[in-house]
Amino acid sequence: MSEGLYEKFLAPDEPFPLLSQRGSASEEGCLDVSDFGCQLSSCHRTDPLHRFHSNRWNLTSCGTSVASSECSEELFSSVSVGDQDDCYSLLDDQDFTSFDLFPEGSVCSDVSSSISTYWDWSDSEFEWQLPGSDIASGSDVLSDIIPSIPSSPCLPSRKKNKHRNLDELPWSAMTNDEQVEYIEYLSRKVSTEMGLREQLDIIKIIDPTAQISPTDSEFIIELNCLTDEKLKQVRSYIKEHSPRQRSTRESWKRTSYSTASTSGVSGASVSSSSASMVSTASSTGSSGGNSASNSSANMSRTHSDSNLSASAAERIRDSKKRSKQRKLQQKALRKRQLKEQRQARKERLSGLFLNEEVLSVKVNEEDHEGDVDVLM
């Protein structure tokens, strides 16, 4: 085969480039495709730039490209048959897989093995067309040529651990972090919303053997002291003695007497009006009396609520003031302890006080029998 045989493709701007040029007639048994005027085109594409571009064979599905000189020589050198009748029979069958286009070990064989994973050559991806026949046309959609690759299934999203409501959990069902968090929440709630008596009661519930001196400014709660039953008692005690519950209970006690009296008056007026049925004036008068009594009850209730809210605000201010004083005392105590530790460390490192001995001296004053005259 001559060196000029199949040396290049035609320019890519021509609509249907020929695959080969006419070869030498001296070589026997060599099939020259141009003898029959055959053209290779895509059955789905009308734009040749997607197949041949800048004299290179572009394989977009694999992301690789092979030089046209290498592919063309190996591609057409293997298509050799005995006579022209066999060539016509091969061309009429339009079975592209019957040709040994890519010999074993060639440059294009590796490409063909990778292409076979994406394209099925038996579906007549390419077809041979004779001159004068209609050109196959199709939609210019990339999905017609390159098959869709199934996407990998989406990974299941990780479920985030929701924050549990610790007020409803028993003590044994909490983790260590949740127990520490809930103890801090309870101590902050009790110290800011309750008085000294309620705090002592809660301490006695948690640790009945705890001994608290009047000078103690804080109480440390150990995690192993709490149980499910103790935590249940603490929660019920906080619910009963919280400022909001206490204010609503006191307001209910104060308004119970006024509501009882107004309900008695309204019930009497309604019964008298329903029994007599004399005129509509009596019913309107009774309804007016009921509205007046209800308005007076509402006024007394709002007045008591305002007093309770003022007392609750004052109690909260006092608790904040006490907590601030307690923090200042703790800070001063910590500062004094750090100073003593620092001084002891300095003395130990200097070595000047290793042989120190502490002696106690006591002086007994002698009682003088008589007065001493200073003027003499």
Curated annotation (Swiss-Prot):
Residues 255-300 have a biased composition (Low complexity). Keywords: Coiled coil. InterPro entries: FAM199X_fam. Pfam families: FAM199X (PF15814). Residues 237-350 are annotated as: Disordered. Residues 320-349 form a coiled coil. Residues 318-337 have a biased composition (Basic residues). The keyword Isomerase does not apply. Residues 237-253, 338-349 have a biased composition (Basic and acidic residues). The keyword Coiled coil applies. PANTHER family: PROTEIN FAM199X. Belongs to the FAM199 family. This is Protein FAM199X.
